[in-house]
Amino acid sequence: MDEKCRKRFDSYKKSLASLAEARERDMRDSFVLSGTSAKFSITFDLAWKVMKDILVQHYAIIDFVAGSPREVLRAAFRAKLIDEEIWMEMLKVRNQLAHDYDGQIVEKYCEDIVKVYIGRLEDFRDVAEAVLADAAQDDF
């Protein structure tokens, strides 16, 4: 994996660790809610970009039409990196959160973010680490 991709993956892991702190926070606090929303969106965006890096560099998948998150998620599912259904749901939530001007959307999805989505983001982190470790061994 090239340096740019490695840095993106490191940023993803740091962002995910920060997001995971939401599990210990009081979700009735509006500041915590808005922080969880922002951190989820950032972490999700880093995740699909890391997926794209892996697909291009380790699976030689380069036939993306637009390179959109939806397209990358579908390719990542076909490569068995993720479960497509939950990730499409997460994409939908991320898109809705971008237009959450009064905090109602994050209130609606906060429990899913904390109890389900963080776990899926952690699962992908583990899969990505395994793929990258295998690739590093192949380099030797």
Residue ranges and their predicted role:
Residues 1-140:
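Solvent-exposed interaction patches of small proteins and small membrane subunits
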